[in-house]
Amino acid sequence: VTAVDGVDLTVREGEVFGVLGRSGAGKSTLLRCVNLLERPDSGRVLIDGSDLLALRGAGLRRARQGIGMIHQHFGLLGSRTVAGNVAFPLEVMGVPRAERAARVAELLDLVGLTEHARAYPAQISGGQKQRVGIARALAGRPKVLLSDEATSALDPETTASILELLRDLNRRLGLTVLLITHEMDVVKRICDSAAVMHAGRFTESGPVTELLARPGSELARGLFPLPPAEPRAGSTVVEVTFVGGATEEPFVSALARKYSVDVNILGGAVETIAGERVGRLQLELPGEPSVNAAQLAFLREAGLSVDVRTSDPAEPLTAEEDAR
């Protein structure tokens, strides 16, 4: 069985990159290939220009120290305190006691657990346990943090706080974060770039704002789920995605005035994602798609992504296809 097949992934330094997919898509295997917990059959794993597949022994161990990892299941040692769990990797690395104590105190302050340093895992909440896991993963001052479904076992409020912490660490430390998730909301909240994975392959990838503006994007439909609307006889249903400055333009009223048509708004949403204002609208225009070619071209020329809904919602037509 091939778990990951022909995947090319580039994560820019200092960004948060999310890999989104259902269970069994190959996400966890991909993540384990990054730090060579799974060794790929072919290809390269480059971090800071070094190919991990070419390293052995001490060289590989040093490279792995630059990669932290957190998991869905926290993996804390029940016999150790919070501080003791964070100190454990430092002990393994042979860090002197005084330096170790200072680093543990720094990390606990970073994740907001200073007051719980002497508590045991059984005495703290799930969200606090994940904070311990994050502090432990950062003990060796890694440049890269891998997150394997780190929030999937948490309630929504705690999930939001952990995602906020990860974004804060990304910005304060210049940390590069590669996370996998099956939750669209995780991508919406903190990811700069993302990829959608099915059956071991990427079906789309790139900066989130670019994916949202791409006609037919699965990610755009997932982040902004609009109610299903099949075209009525003699009408055209259009899904319009707009990013950045386009969110401030009155394109609906401009369309109605220019072509003297009644435009019906069936649904919509506007949010801030990856620092950009992004929105989607579902519009209904009178007439079949062939009649609305000029109107669709008008929307596209305004810098909008346009999907024309067919009777099969899984097979939208783009504005370009409709114009042909």
Residue ranges and their predicted role:
Residues 20-22:
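The feature captures the beta-strand-to-loop junction immediately N-terminal to the Walker
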Residues 35:
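Helix-to-loop junction immediately C-terminal to a conserved catalytic motif
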Residues 50-51, 87, 91, 98-115:
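Conserved ABC ATPase "signature" region
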Residues 52-68, 92, 97-98, 211-215:
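ABC ATPase NBD coupling module
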Residues 80-88:
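Short coil-to-helix segment of the ABC ATPase nucleotide-binding domain corresponding to the Q-loop/switch region
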Residues 119-122, 139-140:
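Conserved signature/switch motifs of ABC ATPase nucleotide-binding domains
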Residues 205-206, 214:
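ABC ATPase "signature
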